């Protein structure tokens, strides 16, 4: 079990509880007790949901209105038909614009700033070559940003992927996913991973067709459905 309290300015902390499928129920309830001690109004992300765990949280009076699927696929996958290029510092403003247009509805990925991008670029895992961009007529149309994990196992993640709304309906989402997966395979990875909102039916269907399957379900629980995420 992994337990983390994420503190946020002017908002209740978010508690993250990560459990393996074979963790004992006692370990789970102990983790929930720790989460409740962080504050009764603290939202709880349960990373690794199953029916028994959900029933227990419901019995405590918690409700869930959001779930994420962690999906994985074996590599390699078919190659993308798109020509992509690596990210450069000069792309920051265009990336922020496309990201915020594509994710204006998203609780975490919306409202990104150049400063946020700079912070991500300063991390040990950042690799500009693994941040693939696709231009149409000189404008950034889509991007696929990958992230490599080494602990507890080597894993290549599609970290953020988006298509500018002006270019929807051209199949760019699928092709950019394939471009990112191809880069990860070229970097030596045999498994690709991503997170997607469970109710994003179009995205889930796209990933299903590529070969992704659901590896884990993460659910957000809270006592008051009006509390900000």
Predicted region positions:
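Conserved donor-binding loop and adjoining core beta-sheet/short helix segment
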Residues: 1-38, 141-155
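A conserved beta-strand-loop-helix scaffold within acyl/acetyltransferase catalytic domains
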Residues: 4-10, 108-163
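Acyl-donor-binding surface of acyltransferase catalytic domains
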Residues: 20-82, 221
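Conserved acetyl-CoA-binding loop-helix of GNAT-fold acetyltransferases
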Residues: 23-37, 160-165, 169-186, 204-209
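Short, high-confidence coil segments that cap the C-terminus of an alpha-helix
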Residues: 39-41, 129, 189
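Conserved hydrophobic beta-strand within the GNAT/NAT acetyltransferase core sheet
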Residues: 44-46, 158, 192-196
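Conserved active-site alpha-helix within GNAT-family acetyltransferase domains
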Residues: 48-66, 174, 198-216, 224
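A short beta-loop-alpha structural element at the N-terminal edge
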Residues: 83-97
